[in-house]
Design a protein with these regions (language model features):
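Catalytic cores of nucleic-acid endonucleases
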Residues: 185-227
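Domain-level recognition of nuclease-like catalytic cores that cleave nucleotide substrates
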Residues: 215-257
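Accessory nucleic acid-recognition modules appended to NTPase machines
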Residues: 3-177
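Hydrophobic/aromatic beta-strand patches that form the interior of the parallel beta-sheet core
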Residues: 106, 157, 179-181, 210-212, ...
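Residues at the C-termini of beta-strands that transition into short coil/loop
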Residues: 109, 160, 184, 213-215, ...
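Short conserved micro-motifs at the rims of enzyme active sites and ligand-binding pockets
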Residues: 117-119, 182, 192-193, 222, ...
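Short secondary-structure transition/capping segments
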Residues: 82, 134-138, 200-208, 254-257
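Active-site ExK catalytic segment of metal-dependent nucleases
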Residues: 172, 177-188
Length: 257
């Protein structure tokens, strides 16, 4: 959210993010009468924020919130329709099998997700598991944003095998996987970080394999391109509409305490 950069301190930023979330509830959802009963939807937002970037268990969320599975599905549809986030579907060449697997949902802004999950007061340390989640969330949002500017946008999906091996993002056009993307928050990419990407990407017939991270060095490990996240995204979205905002820094997103 651009408004955050104009605020002077973290307290003001936290207050803004919480107020934004409440305004969304009042004006976008209740005001437009997307839902008749706001209480379960409010509970759903909290759970959805906690589940950000994870496989969606519609039945489990419904049980926690007190609504049925179809209602949870309609809630997620409301979020996508109001541009509050993006559903990333699982990859499978069979549409029928794809529909049997669970999608992931990413809120459009890491700060809003943290406000809704009530974690704004928890510091995000670079070595923590939470930092890895926030970094992945940040990169996915950048990919979604840059992809929207493309004349011929990619179809975005993720891949997860039965033994829980995963590729974070697949970028497809014309039924072909042009990029298989692994997101790592490390500042020192090693062979262990790209092992699964190498194998699964090869099985998929992906044209290019890339790992983007906080590592400033450009290298190639076992056929996998390894780039800093900024240059990596510039490489993927290399046309004139795909340039990153030069003023954008990750610390501006996650260092809100």
């Amino acid at each position: 959210l651009p408004e955050l950069y104009e605020l002077e301190n973290d307290i003001e930023r936290e207050q803004f993010l919480r107020a934004y979330a409440l305004t969304y509830l009042k004006e976008e959802i209740w005001g437009e009468q997307f839902v008749r009963n706001l209480d379960p939807f409010r509970s759903f937002l909290s759970v959805a924020a906690q589940m950000n970037g994870k496989l969606i268990n519609f039945t489990g969320i419904g049980r926690d919130v007190g609504v049925d599975t179809k209602t949870v599905q309609s809630y997620y549809q409301i979020l996508t329709d109001t541009l509050v986030g993006t559903l990333i579907e699982p990859h499978h060449r069979s549409i029928r099998k794809r529909q049997r697997q669970a999608p992931k949902f990413y809120f459009f802004d890491t700060g809003i997700q943290r406000a809704l999950s009530d974690t704004l007061d928890q510091p995000v340390k670079p070595t923590s598991y939470q930092y890895g989640n926030v970094f992945e969330h940040f990169i996915v949002n950048e990919v979604v944003k840059l992809n929207a500017y493309q004349r011929h946008p990619f179809s975005l999906s993720y891949m997860r095998t039965e033994d829980d091996v995963e590729i974070d993002l697949l970028l497809e056009r014309g039924g072909k996987v042009l990029w298989a993307l692994e997101i790592k928050s490390t500042d020192q990419v090693q062979a262990k970080h790209v092992r699964h990407l190498k194998q699964l990407g090869k099985d998929l017939g992906a044209h290019r394999l890339i790992c983007i991270s906080r590592d400033n060095s450009v290298k190639q490990i076992d056929g996998v391109l390894c780039h800093h996240w900024r240059t990596g995204l510039d490489l993927i979205f290399s046309d004139k509409h795909g340039k990153l905002d030069p003023g954008l820094e990750l610390h501006e997103v996650v260092d809100l305490k």
